[in-house]
Amino acid sequence: MKISTSQFKNGLKIIINDQPCSILEHEFHKPGKGQAVMRVKFRNLITGKVVDKTYKSGESVEEADIMTLEMSYLYSDGEQWQFMNSSTYEQIGINRNIVGDAKKWIIGQENCEVVIWNDEPISVEAPPFVELSIAKSDPGIKGDTVSGATKPAELETGVTIQVPLFVEEGEKIKVDTRSGEYSGRV
């Protein structure tokens, strides 16, 4: 389906150079002389690159047929990560390269958002917050409590993040997957 530049909005999925893209920002610009244009900043959903492009007012582009499904992570066999559709119970294998950064935060049974284009998964997003155990952490040094003092801690997934000094090895914590920061105790 074709969509006009006047209908652009942030988050809209369109096809550019035969690849799906998501509009991050758009701005209508009317110069004093000449035709009005729409300046668009978008992210390629396959490569992740952010690109700027200018369209003439009234131009149209193809809208991307993209589905976002909530799927539960089941297990990984090295190359393929197995996910199950939460509503149909259908299982699909997704290549580890497509899973990307989400693999740092998921260990099993988490509900992730899987983006599908042309019946193929193109990206996986971890839930915004996950609860993980601390696998390895040095004890906090008594007296080393300057405001906001932190120490490195390795999580059960192998990722190392900064946590407050009072958090100890074996504790479950809440982590913000978008920033990779400690969010609180569980």
Task: Show the residue positions of the predicted features.
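Acidic-enriched and Gly/Ser
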Residues: 2-156, 160-186
